[in-house]
Amino acid sequence: MPQEQYSHHRSTMPSSEGPHIYKVGIYGWRKRCLYFFVLLLMILILVNLAMTIWILKVMNFTIDGMGNLRITEKGLKLEGDSEFLQPLYAKEIKSRPGNALYFKSARNVTVNILNDQTKVLTQLVTGPKAVEAYGKRFEVKTVSGKLLFSADDSEVVVGAERLRVLGAEGTVFPKSIETPNVRADPFKELRLESPTRSLVMEAPKGVEINAEAGNMEAICRSELRLESKDGEIKLDAAKIKLPRLPRGSYTPTGTRQKVFEVCVCANGRLFLSQAGTGSTCQINTSVCL
C-alpha cells in the first residue's frame, strides 16, 4: 500500500526537465568542404562555358554549318581551301559554277575505283615525276563522245583525223606500223629512216609514193633495188638521167662524139658506150666483167 501511494505521487509530480531537441545539418569542416566543392563546380561551369563560346567563335559555328563548311539540302559545301588528313569518301565532288576544282598534295594524288570487295579496279596516280593510270582500258573522248585515243593490252587506237609528232628526232617504232597514209605537214619534208636496220613497206594492193610540190629522194649506202615479180617497172618522165653510169672505152681513131648509147650486160648491169655508125656495145664488154 505505501508503495502504490509513492508511485502515484511520483507520477503526478511535474517534470522539471524540458523536451529533447535534435539538431540536423552539416557543421564544421564538412560544411566548409561542401562550400568549396560548390564553388569549384561553379568555376568549372564558367570555364567550360567560356571555352565553348571561344570554340564557337574560333570555329565560326553558325546555323548553316561550321567555318567554311556549310550544310545545304544537296549536301556539304566547302568555301575556300580545305585540307583532309584522312581518306575522303564522297559520291560526288564538284566546284562552284564558274570556278575550277584544284587537288593539291605534297606527294601525290591517288584516285581509286573499288568494287564491292574493296578491290582496286582502276587507279590514277599523279606524282611529282609521272602520271600513272592502271586499268584494263584507257580512253580519251571528246565532249560529243567521239573516241580520240584508247589503249589496252592488245592495241592502241588513235581516233583523231591526224596524228602529229613534233619531236626533233621524229617517231621511233621498234616494231612494224600499219597505216593507210603517211604524210608530212604542208611545206614540210617527210623522211622515213632506219639508221641500223632495213626499211620495208608492204601493201597487198600497192604502195604509192607521191610528192606533189617537191622532189622525192631515195638514198642508200650500198644497193637500191626495184623489183617487180609479176608486173613492170615504169619510169614515166619527160627526162630520165643516169649521170653516174660507167662508160666504155672508145677508139682514138674514131670520131669522138658526145652521144652515147645505153648498153645492158648479161647480168643486168647498165653502162654507156660511145655511139658510132653501128652499135659499140660489143666493143666495150669489158665493163660487164
UniProtKB/Swiss-Prot annotation:
Coiled coil start-end: none
Residues spanning the signal sequence: none
Pfam families found in the cross-reference section: Sarcoglycan_1
Listed GO biological process terms: calcium ion homeostasis; calcium-mediated signaling; cardiac muscle cell contraction; cardiac muscle cell development; cardiac muscle contraction; coronary vasculature morphogenesis; heart process; membrane organization
Keyword Glycoprotein part of the UniProt annotation: yes
Membrane side Cytoplasmic: residue ranges: 1-37
Intervals, Extracellular compartment: 57-289
Assembly description: Interacts with FLNC. Cross-link to form 2 major subcomplexes: one consisting of SGCB, SGCD and SGCG and the other consisting of SGCB and SGCD. The association between SGCB and SGCG is particularly strong while SGCA is loosely associated with the other sarcoglycans. Interacts with DAG1.
Family classification: Belongs to the sarcoglycan beta/delta/gamma/zeta family.
Topology in the lipid bilayer: Single-pass type II membrane protein
Localization of this protein: Cell membrane, Sarcolemma; Cytoplasm, Cytoskeleton
GO CC entries: cytoskeleton; dystroglycan complex; plasma membrane; sarcoglycan complex; sarcolemma; sarcoplasmic reticulum
The UniProt record lists the keyword Transmembrane: yes
Keyword terms of this UniProt record: Cell membrane, Cytoplasm, Cytoskeleton, Disulfide bond, Glycoprotein, Membrane, Signal-anchor, Transmembrane, Transmembrane helix
Entry comment describing in which tissues the protein is expressed: Most strongly expressed in skeletal and heart muscle. Also detected in proliferating myoblasts.
Post-translational changes noted in the entry: Disulfide bonds are present.
Transmembrane segments: 38-56
InterPro entries assigned: Sarcoglycan, Sarcoglycan_gamma/delta/zeta
Source organism per UniProt: Mus musculus
Intrachain disulfide bonds: 263-288, 265-281
Protein name (Swiss-Prot/TrEMBL): Delta-sarcoglycan
Organism domain of life: Eukaryota
Glycosylation sites: 60, 108, 284
Task performed by this protein: Component of the sarcoglycan complex, a subcomplex of the dystrophin-glycoprotein complex which forms a link between the F-actin cytoskeleton and the extracellular matrix.
